[in-house]
Amino acid sequence: MSFTVYPALDIRNARVVRLLQGDYARETQYGDDVLPRAQAFADAGAQWMHLVDLDAAKAGGYTLAGTLGEIARATGLRVQTGGGVRSREDVARILDAGAARVVIGSLAVRNSEMVVGWLQEFGADRLTIALDTRQDADGIWQLPVHGWTEAADATLDQLAVRYARAGLQHLLCTDIARDGMLSGPNMALYGHLRALTPQLQVQVSGGARNLADVAAAKAAGCAGIVLGKALLEGHLNLDEALAC
């Protein structure tokens, strides 16, 4: 299995931002130079990037189709993107706009039966399921919903197995406690997922801060790692991460 580094840009109000643990009230802005940043990713040798529409994630209705198309045309990057995907039409529109892969998050938790149908319709290589998780007091990995205030009916383990059996290829998993904290990825979580669903290509997300974290994700047999805040704040050099 090859290993992919996904430099990431989260967009809100046409600006590059980062949220702490997904909290919209704890936002750091990094400017509105979206295309130049994407071009810099390509110039460093990246093949892929991860693009998130935070406005749509909150309100629904993907808003970055124009930006996505511009990035894909200008840079040649393959773009994995999501935010606010609520319907089959959303998936089709984002793919038509130039996405290589569409990320489906909360809907994948709320309506797995519908999303499984999309795997068959659009092809498993065109979709990434993104599951945000938090470990409860009993050590169970829950899937918080409704603004991360309640737990879904299914646990992370149950949903990962369900999707794996349905033919899912790409799973992006974020430990909420690590998201945006530069505290290192929770490699125990990813080791657990790899053992539970070895057929899935698991992407590490949340907490990456240095080359050692990239190397650890690769050594654990994960398929890739999403790098956001560490790149934006200069803790990590993309050229070195790509060569790791």
Swiss-Prot record:
Chief location: cytoplasm
UniProt family annotation: Belongs to the HisA/HisF family.
Catalysed conversion reaction: 1-(5-phospho-beta-D-ribosyl)-5-[(5-phospho-beta-D-ribosylamino)methylideneamino]imidazole-4-carboxamide = 5-[(5-phospho-1-deoxy-D-ribulos-1-ylimino)methylamino]-1-(5-phospho-beta-D-ribosyl)imidazole-4-carboxamide
Active site: D10, D132
Gene: hisA
GO molecular function: 1-(5-phosphoribosyl)-5-[(5-phosphoribosylamino)methylideneamino]imidazole-4-carboxamide isomerase activity
Location of the protein in the cell: Cytoplasm
Pathway annotation from the record: Amino-acid biosynthesis; L-histidine biosynthesis; L-histidine from 5-phospho-alpha-D-ribose 1-diphosphate: step 4/9
InterPro entries linked to this entry: Aldolase_TIM, His_biosynth, HisA_bact_arch, Isoase_HisA-like, Isoase_HisA-like_bact, RibuloseP-bd_barrel
Cellular component aspect of the GO annotation: cytoplasm
Source organism phylogeny: Bacteria, Pseudomonadati, Pseudomonadota, Gammaproteobacteria, Lysobacterales
Metal-binding keyword on record: no
Pfam families: His_biosynth
Protein name: 1-(5-phosphoribosyl)-5-[(5-phosphoribosylamino)methylideneamino] imidazole-4-carboxamide isomerase
CDD domains assigned: HisA
UniProt keyword list: Amino-acid biosynthesis, Cytoplasm, Histidine biosynthesis, Isomerase
NCBIfam families: 1-(5-phosphoribosyl)-5-[(5-phosphoribosylamino)methylideneamino]imidazole-4-carboxamide isomerase
Magnesium keyword on record: no
GO biological process: L-histidine biosynthetic process; L-tryptophan biosynthetic process
Cysteine-cysteine disulfides: none
Domain of life: Bacteria
Family matches, as HAMAP family: HisA (MF_01014)
E.C. designation(s): 5.3.1.16
